[in-house]
Amino acid sequence: MEEAKIPMLKLGPITFNLTLLAVCIVTIAVIFAFVFWASRQMKLKPEGKQTALEYLISFVDGIGEEHLDHNLQKSYSLLLFTIFLFVAVANNLGLFTKLETVNGYNLWTSPTANLAFDLALSLFITLMVHIEGVRRRGLVAHLKRLATPWPMTPMNLLEEFTNFLSLAIRLFGNIFAGEVVTGLIVQLANYRVYWWPIAFLVNMAWTAFSVFISCIQAFVFTKLTATYLGKKVNESEE
């Protein structure tokens, strides 16, 4: 299977992946459109789209309640909800269509199937939880935790690095593998006409399974974010 080319834009020393930028914008637009649509004409007794939105909010709030102190959970509920929606939509975006130019340039993919994107997202989470730790507990107390007990300081620092790395690689591995298998199934239909029905059925089953896995990965990513955040800001961690 021939590897698709990626359209790039080079500005000075920085090279931009145009496909990745485009699908990130689409991801944000989809999330905004869904929340805007679901939050219109809200009623005291929720129904339909409002029920779906409130269920999602309650579901993500439940994640925060497990790992954050009660007095802090509401402060981070919107952040966790945004992370969950963003990762869930980004994971599934590349499963349902494939866009390529006649020159072989790939114009559509899941943002989270790109390792650089996942590393950047993981770096944002890592920096955010440390900044919140300093803001909530103070710089001295935050650094003290990393050096307690002091003989374990190197291991504590290594743990922070592995948390950052595993958060990105876990997400990338699952989503990238899903897109690769989907591509292989689609290629199956190109060999013989009589393979089309089989490829179609297998692709439908695999796509449904991939959607499930993508949502699970969004849940895991959000849960780990709440876990790391709780370790830095909870008073019980003093």
UniProtKB/Swiss-Prot annotation:
Key component of the proton channel; it plays a direct role in the translocation of protons across the membrane. Its main location: membrane. It comes from the Bacteria. The chain crosses the membrane at residues 18-38, 76-96, 114-134, 166-186, 193-213. Gene3D superfamilies: ATP synthase, F0 complex, subunit A. SUPFAM superfamilies: F1F0 ATP synthase subunit A. This is ATP synthase subunit a. InterPro entries: ATP_syn_F0_a_bact/chloroplast, ATP_synth_F0_asu, ATP_synth_F0_asu_AS, F0_ATP_A_sf. The keyword DNA-binding does not apply. NCBIfam families: ATP_synt_6_or_A, PRK05815.1-4. GO terms for molecular function: proton-transporting ATP synthase activity, rotational mechanism. Keywords: ATP synthesis, Cell membrane, CF(0), Hydrogen ion transport, Ion transport, Membrane, Transmembrane, Transmembrane helix, Transport. The keyword Manganese does not apply.
